[in-house]
Amino acid sequence: MITQRPKGTLDWYGDNMYKRTLIEELARKLCKAYNIKEIITPVFEHTILFQRGVGETTDVVQKEMYTFLDKKDRSITLKPEGTAGAIRAYLENNLYAESGPTKLFYVTPAFRYEQPQSGRLRQHHQFGVEFVGSKSPLAEVELITLITTFLKEIGLKKAKLHINSIGCKNCRATYNEALLTYLRKHEDHLCSTCKERMQKNPLRVIDCKESACKEIVKDAPRTIEYLDEECKNHFEELQSLLHTLNIPFEIDTGIVRGLDYYTKTVFEFVNEDGFTLCGGGRYDGLVHEIDEKQDIPSVGFGMGIERILYFLEKEEVSLPPQPAIELYVGILGAEAKASAYQLVTKLRGEGIITETDYMDRSVKAQMKYANKIGAKNTVILGADELAKGLANVKNMETGEQTELPLEDIADFILKNA
């Protein structure tokens, strides 16, 4: 037990760690181009933040949070998602005092106690963006454009954008009445969870994954039929902007997202098999829910990195391989150790990926190891090489050897990389 990781977690190393790093680097590169600043918030927050922000009736709050009492009996929760913590930090640090909208991104661990499955873990890592301060649909379009670019660059080029509008608090109340009336006619055929949901928050029934419930909600009232004038105009402007930018989309009235803070626009990117790659939407009431003195519109999205990695593998998308070791510096004799490591340090300072021997192996064993780790070139340094100031650099693929002054090795490797 002590040598086994907890259920629903991963150890990151080797190729998986490298692929995860590529995804995170791409996220940071794109956010830099969009002038979105990185934010890091605590791994844990006061439980009430998620109860008020995410929503008391959500599965996340009711069933999936890792919550505990600290040594002073304060209720603390490991963050199940990134938005609530980012908005809390935005408010606490008075970021709203800055002129213009505030655009933040994070790459963070998140924790949910749910049944582990492919691409879904109890500890996962989330790339998310929060665009705070704009009520314009252009804010949604900016995030949708960023995600579209991200998915194309990472290799998931067939992802499709699905959008919906679930309205604001006012039109949602009218819709909930109509939905509840409809659901009551089919209550006997709903799953036990949805029978509870329909009383507390009927919109959650639309999100149910049980086949019987999915069949029932096919004919349920649609949120877009109950939008007030403002929400309707917002949704129409969003569609117009997407058309103008040639971003294809599909209106999917089954999207409501699983968190209570969403208003107006909700969206998901799905693959060809209909599995969600990432999702987000507008949450104009979340800031006010956390701090009643503030009322600031916002929009954001979250993307599970493990989920992206899972679909990259499933769809057989090849990512760039790890950079090869450019040079292995072999050591012949104890007297050459210091000088060899001096060369290694110089090469690394030039940005050349370099390895050497730390195990006092024979030269034959060192060359075998260099071949095993995929070194592109090797060089052996011993007393003769140091005395002459010359050494032979061997290309491991062709077997070709080139005699060089020691001080020219770095330039040679860089030129032939």
Swiss-Prot record:
Q: What is its EC number?
A: 6.1.1.21
Biological process (GO), any one: histidyl-tRNA aminoacylation
Where is it predominantly found? cytoplasm
GO MF terms, alphabetically ordered? ATP binding; catalytic activity, acting on a protein; histidine-tRNA ligase activity; transferase activity
Q: Where in the cell is it found?
A: Cytoplasm
Give the signal peptide range. none
SUPFAM superfamilies, sorted? Class II aaRS ABD-related, Class II aaRS and biotin synthetases
Alphabetically ordered keywords of this record: Aminoacyl-tRNA synthetase, ATP-binding, Cytoplasm, Ligase, Nucleotide-binding, Protein biosynthesis
Spell out the CDD domains in the cross-references: HisRS-like_core (cd00773), HisRS_anticodon (cd00859)
For this protein, the record's Pfam families field holds: HGTP_anticodon, tRNA-synt_His
- InterPro entries recorded for this chain? aa-tRNA-synth_II, aa-tRNA-synth_II/BPL/LPL, Anticodon-bd, Anticodon-bd_dom_sf, His-tRNA-ligase, HisRS-like_core, HisRS/HisZ, HisRS_anticodon
Task: Kindly state which reaction or reactions the protein catalyses.
Answer: tRNA(His) + L-histidine + ATP = L-histidyl-tRNA(His) + AMP + diphosphate + H(+)
Q: Which GO terms describe its cellular component?
A: cytoplasm
The record's subunit annotation is: Homodimer.
What does the sequence similarity comment in the record state about its family? Belongs to the class-II aminoacyl-tRNA synthetase family.
Question: In its UniProt entry, what is this protein called?
Answer: Histidine--tRNA ligase
Protein source organism? Lachnoclostridium phytofermentans (strain ATCC 700394 / DSM 18823 / ISDg)
| Taxonomic classification | Bacteria, Bacillati, Bacillota, Clostridia, Lachnospirales
